[in-house]
Amino acid sequence: MARRQDEARAGVPLRVEGPPDKEVHLILYHWTHSFSSQKVRLVIAEKALKCEEHDVSLPLSEHNEPWFMRLNSAGEVPVLVHGENIICEATQIIDYLEQTFLDERTPRLMPDEGSMYYPRVQHYRELLDSLPMDAYTHGCILHPELTVDSMIPAYATTRIRSQIGNTESELKKLAEENPDLQEAYIAKQKRLKSKLLDHDNVKYLKKILDELEKVLDQVETELQRRNEETPEEGNQPWLCGESFTLADVSLAVTLHRLKFLGFARRNWGHGKRPNLETYYERVLKRKTFNKVLGHVNNILISAVLPTAFRVAKKRAPKVLGSTLVVGLLVGMGYFAFMLFRRRLGSMILALRPRPNYF
């Protein structure tokens, strides 16, 4: 595996080939605040699979670096590596995990196709996965006036908004510096430009937020059905039945992201959609969810400090030695904590020219 990663960095194309070997450990390239990455990480936790995780920092534009673009020409996280197989895009990764690890010790998150629950789970999974989460995310940054109680600090929102325009020029520069990846960089540049034209359109954002409410109405009705089907002494059900399924993965991570963006009160606050509110509160207490995603909405712990540590480690001279480097990291962590409300995030983001969040 190490050899294959060296090849990726050297420009040798990576191939997806051969049957999956369940004995080979999984490697996941992800970013903590990536919505798609969060779904994959929750699935891995629910299935109790051993996985080596590597952060690909979006604030530091590591997903645009040549080695990663050779791993996934779209330049997007997550990416799963399993032996000789490289799987990109969250839905494909989740399907791969569900279809590959079939032993009795590994929990199944999708009912058998002949089961009465299969159509229900498949419907809600597809419905929830069709939501334009990237548009909600970018939209709340570009139009924070549409959010309430957003967990993204105001200074970070301002900083990110001012840097979004730099992404195109960064990709153009990388395309010029890496001729073998020029086509991939140009394609990503075009996709990003097209997205931003929509995401900066406040009418479009209001439209998709209204459509989101219709989807959540369906979910609320389905949760009510589960409550009516369950005897008082029975186990509390999930979205499609007694078992936690891929539909629940999609719903749980969606609600957590909406809470982070500042769309919770609009969609399940003040007694609106009470079943949805109860469901989300229950999800927060689920052991696997709490382990994987319990801290991600705290931007200090999940983004600012890890980025600070990464920058400090990269910039610390090798002659300092490991002990002093660790001391610097601890000191920076304390410094970050004390100055978080005084715009530490802006300082960290400013350490690298032209960062982007896409």
Swiss-Prot record:
GO terms for biological process: cellular response to vitamin D; mitochondrial fission; mitochondrial fusion; protein targeting to mitochondrion; response to retinoic acid. This is Ganglioside-induced differentiation-associated protein 1. It is a multi-pass membrane protein. Residues 24-105 form the GST N-terminal domain. One of its GO terms (cellular component) is mitochondrial outer membrane. Belongs to the GST superfamily. Its main location: mitochondrion. Keywords: Acetylation, Coiled coil, Cytoplasm, Isopeptide bond, Membrane, Mitochondrion, Mitochondrion outer membrane, Transmembrane, Transmembrane helix, Ubl conjugation. It holds the Pfam family GST_C_2. Regulates the mitochondrial network by promoting mitochondrial fission. The keyword Phosphoprotein does not apply. It comes from the Eukaryota. The lineage of its organism: Eukaryota, Metazoa, Chordata, Craniata, Vertebrata. Ubiquitinated by PRKN during mitophagy, leading to its degradation and enhancement of mitophagy. Deubiquitinated by USP30. Homodimer. It comes from Mus musculus. Residues 320-358 are annotated as: Required for mitochondrial localization. Expressed in brain, spinal cord, muscles and intestinal villi. In the central nervous system expressed most prominently in the cortex, cerebellum, thalamus, olfactory bulb, and spinal cord. Expressed also in sciatic nerves and in dorsal root ganglia. Residues 153-309 form the GST C-terminal domain. There is a cross-link at residues 50, 172-173, 188, 190, 203, 206-207, 214 (Glycyl lysine isopeptide (Lys-Gly) (interchain with G-Cter in ubiquitin)). It is found in: Mitochondrion outer membrane; Cytoplasm. The chain crosses the membrane at residues 292-312, 320-340. The modification N6-acetyllysine is found at residue 203. Induction: Increased expression during neural differentiation.
